[in-house]
Amino acid sequence: MIAELIREIGIEGARFIEENIDEQFKALSYLSEGMDRVNFVRLVIANALVSYQLTGKGEMWWWEFAKYFKGKEVKTIYSAYKEFLPNSKFNRRLIQQKLLRIKKIEPFLSTLTEESIERYYEDMTLLWKAIAKVLKVDRESKTVVFSVKMFGYAARIVLSKFNPYPMEIPIPEDVRIIKLTRKLTNERPRDFWMKIAKESNVPPLHIDSILWPLLGGARVEEAPPELKEKLEKLIRVIR
């Protein structure tokens, strides 16, 4: 049943949710205005990689990030986060571990150019593999796949172009997705949602975009009537 509902919503429905309902996308759009495009993309990837063990809702954390860096000159991402994280309201845990991760990824981020951003946006699996290799972590780990999702948002904003996410990249296993999966099956979240992705022809990162805001209580009133009806059906199944 859930595969059928996701198929009905489709990639275009997921795109509507991403661009009009997901607060993370709204926060990035706000931050991007007046900011250097490459620096914006670098910051978004870095922030996604430290978006775990939060001390508040993910939506609030991304708005905190966007407001903090709006109009701010960033000399190095590491020095900026050394100041930002200890004073953050929504990301106060494991600060040293997160700073170490920023330090590891910054040399790679500093190589990004407009050309390489376009190249990675054309094939997001390349970025996925590159980030995992630099950090020496499993490429299916939550923050690595999540960083590709947020890169997709950032690239879409700066390039004014929509490219769907690749089917191969699994869903980020965050608390909301894990809880929902337990309600539906005994399978591992990434395996279950990959199966749903193939059945519905909607890539896992777009499935995440559909589910995650709805599980967080997002309202769907502004969706077009046909999509709104489909989302309300899905909400009855997942909430």
Curated annotation (Swiss-Prot):
For the keyword Transferase, the answer is: no
Query: Which residues carry out catalysis?
Result: 142, 174
Quickly give the catalysed reaction.
2'-deoxyribonucleotide-(2'-deoxyribose 5'-phosphate)-2'-deoxyribonucleotide-DNA = a 3'-end 2'-deoxyribonucleotide-(2,3-dehydro-2,3-deoxyribose 5'-phosphate)-DNA + a 5'-end 5'-phospho-2'-deoxyribonucleoside-DNA + H(+)
Any GO BP annotation: base-excision repair
Q: Which positions does UniProt annotate for 8-oxoguanine binding?
A: 24, 51, 62, 146, 172, 208, 212
Q: What is its EC number?
A: 3.2.2.-, 4.2.99.18
Q: Molecular function (GO) terms listed?
A: class I DNA-(apurinic or apyrimidinic site) endonuclease activity; oxidized base lesion DNA N-glycosylase activity
> Does Lyase show up as a keyword for this record?
yes
> Domain of life of the organism in this record?
Archaea
Q: Which SUPFAM superfamilies match?
A: DNA-glycosylase
- Stored Gene3D superfamilies: Hypothetical protein, domain 2
Matching entries from Pfam families are given as: AGOG
Region spans: Helix-hairpin-helix = 118-182
User: What job does the chain carry out?
Assistant: DNA repair enzyme that is part of the base excision repair (BER) pathway; protects from oxidative damage by removing the major product of DNA oxidation, 8-oxoguanine (GO), from single- and double-stranded DNA substrates.
**Domain comment, in the record's words?**
Contains two alpha-helical subdomains, with the 8-oxoguanine binding site located in a cleft at their interface. Contains a helix-hairpin-helix (HhH) structural motif and a Gly/Pro-rich sequence followed by a conserved Asp (HhH-GPD motif).
Its family remark reads:
Belongs to the archaeal N-glycosylase/DNA lyase (AGOG) family.
Official protein name in the record: N-glycosylase/DNA lyase
